[in-house]
């Protein structure tokens, strides 16, 4: 399991050459990663940022089988408590991974255009309240097809000082943006690349009054 961003030594890299390069079936390995200052938010970042981690043994095949996840790191002194890392300057954090899972060796029928592994609106649980502070952690992974333009209907986000309603992510890139919902209702969240959206890379999320 290979992480991005955090501090690790060779045995905890999760790639060729270290003790943790691979874990055999039925075996265990404990990785040690450090969220040091260089892994946390930079001066121009929001108070929490996102990193990816994923398999690096048969990277392409195993990532396409779902061996991928995210880490969120909060700036030192900004967490609500030792047991609650949610930053004090936001009310909620959401994480979304935009990825085309390739399950059948590039055959179109095996390309699953997903948000968090779900497509065609089958992603539940994303609700916020009007006027609350919401941070969206957005990531992408995959191949040259995984250039995504993430679009929120009805709302805008603040992305590194820039106001927009679309953010761009490339394969293995990550970004964190802030939103204060201003319009209640059920809203689309989707990739604005036309064939990605039509193939199912879209869902609804809810803003409560």
Where on the chain are the PLM-derived regions?
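Copper-binding active sites and cupredoxin-like electron-transfer domains
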Residues: 1-209
């Amino acid at each position: 399991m290979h992480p991005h961003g955090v501090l690790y030594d060779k045995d905890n890299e999760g790639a060729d050459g270290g003790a943790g390069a691979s874990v055999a079936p039925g075996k265990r390995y404990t990785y040690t990663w450090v969220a040091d200052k260089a892994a946390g938010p930079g001066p121009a970042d929001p108070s929490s940022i996102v990193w990816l981690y994923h398999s690096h043994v048969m990277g392409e095949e195993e990532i396409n089988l779902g061996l991928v996840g995210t880490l969120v790191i909060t700036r030192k002194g900004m967490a609500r408590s030792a047991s609650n890392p949610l930053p004090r300057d936001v009310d909620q954090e959401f994480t979304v991974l935009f990825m085309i899972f390739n399950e059948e060796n590039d055959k179109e029928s095996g390309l699953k255009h997903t948000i968090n592994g779900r497509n065609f609106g089958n992603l539940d649980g994303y609700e916020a309240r009007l006027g609350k502070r919401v941070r969206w952690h957005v990531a992408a992974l995959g191949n040259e097809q995984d250039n995504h333009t993430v679009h929120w209907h009805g709302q805008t986000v603040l992305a590194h000082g820039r106001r927009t309603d679309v953010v761009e992510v490339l394969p293995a890139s990550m970004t964190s943006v802030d939103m204060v919902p201003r319009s209640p209702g059920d809203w689309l969240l989707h990739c604005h690349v036309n064939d990605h959206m039509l193939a199912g890379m879209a869902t609804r999320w809810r803003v409560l009054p």
